[in-house]
């Protein structure tokens, strides 16, 4: 009897989702058209207000919450989040769908409008189509179908759209967690529809350690570099040491966890940006850049480490490398500023939500 009921529900949900495919595309397009670039953190309120209208129509009680005082929050770029909750007929556990609303910078080389949401050959193109406005749209459509198929469900359903995931989440999930919105008493199960292979369940993530490294020199006239000390050349030695020593060592470290994609099994580090010398001229000006010897050069690093590694060891490895350069390079001075740290996490593969999703993947896609 229970098996027949499940099969009937599966058929009903499949049909309801099928007839909503066009709505899924349109919702994804609408979300893409709201340019929530982070940094700096644009249009968070606009996307929250859009989601508020959508969720309110299907009976969700919503809250739009500003993460006031968090990193990046300002009157110009306030960090807004939305949480919607819908209670079932009877009490029970809560399933929460969380998606971040921010997207990274656009970059170069686009052949489509990055905020146009254009459909081409069966795909939606735009910044955030994959990461992760498509996932946000999918969770809303799935919940809409579920509510129609199971109007008398038990427990509660929540959907959130949160800010700043791309820059650490302090103005989003972290703030809401500190305020108790994800407490075990309120939420028992969480699904985050981040982009991955559709037949895979991601149970955890690597740790992250972000830092700024600054090397120092002495400013001087460009015609007399011997009178100064070039901070960019000092940074060049740091980058060379990364290439010669650090990156090869990271390549050797491989997790025992079943991680995909393959490259994520290793420890990694990205050099996000580099800035050296004087202020760049106004792009609209025809002036030539400064000819001074630079007295400062800064890089931002993003070190992703394995669950088998310790964040303090990760930090010490960078500092030891810099101290090694200092011991052999005259006038080498540096400063390390920690910007962010995220500890690796792992969900038990026997958790009810994991087993339920695994069963659904097998049912829909025929894959275990």
Q: Positions of the model-derived regions?
A:
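Acidic/His- and Gly-rich active-site-bordering loop/insert found
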Residues: 2-124, 148-153
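Generic non-transmembrane alpha-helical segments
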Residues: 16, 26-30, 34, 50, ...
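Short glycine/proline-enriched loop/turn "hinge" motifs that connect secondary-structure elements
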Residues: 20, 107-109, 151, 202-208, ...
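An extended, acidic, His-containing surface patch that forms the Zn2+-binding/catalytic region
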Residues: 60-65, 90-92, 250-283, 287, ...
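Hydrophobic beta-strand positions in extracellular immunoglobulin-like domains
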Residues: 86, 215, 303-305
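Short pre-catalytic strand/loop immediately N-terminal to key active-site residues, enriched for Gly-Thr
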Residues: 120-132, 366-368
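Acidic/histidine-rich catalytic neighborhood of metal-dependent amide-processing enzymes
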Residues: 132-206, 210
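Acidic-enriched catalytic cores of C-N bond-cleaving enzymes acting on peptides and small amides
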Residues: 203, 222-293, 307-334
